A protein has these predicted regions:
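HAD-like aspartate-dependent phosphatase fold
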Residues: 2-148
């Protein structure tokens, strides 16, 4: 069954679960693949959710998943930003995904980078205008696609 594969990547929503319900056989499949020695990675394109939140949710549903196996859009973006080593950033993001950026110096007045995620109701003219002025003054932009 494993062939030349070293690992398997699963999306959370619509693959492992949908609207809070586990797809039949999904838990057993992951357990079986793990028992065969395959590396498991779980992906979510959500900017609102942290790795920890996703792992905890899946564990409550019966999956044997570890936080380190989960990659969310906010986590991947925070890792990318860390490689850039900015002096500061303004993270326009709400929800648990914001916790992935806790190690950065946050500055919404003179950030080196502006990170845009799902900012919900605070994604308004005032903040967009502020971001545009900061970009024109030299801040750089990193964008995540908001959740639908």
């Amino acid at each position: 069954m494993t062939g030349n594969f070293k690992g398997v990547i699963f999306d959370i929503d619509g693959i492992l679960e949908f609207q809070g319900k586990v797809y039949p056989g999904a838990i057993e499949l992951i357990d079986r693949l793990r028992a065969k020695g395959l590396v498991i990675r779980i992906l979510s394109n959500s900017t609102l959710k942290s790795r920890e939140y996703c792992a905890e949710k899946l564990v409550k549903m019966g999956f044997s998943i570890f936080k380190e196996e989960v990659i969310t859009a906010s986590y991947a973006t925070a890792r990318y930003l860390k490689r850039l080593n900015p002096k500061s950033c303004w993270v326009m993001l709400k929800g648990k995904g914001f916790t992935e950026f806790q190690d950065f110096i946050h500055d919404d007045e003179n950030p080196a980078y502006i990170v845009v995620g799902d900012y919900r109701e605070e994604f308004n003219f005032q903040n967009l205008n502020k971001a545009l002025k900061l970009l024109l003054a030299g801040s750089k932009l990193v964008v995540m696609i908001p959740e639908k």
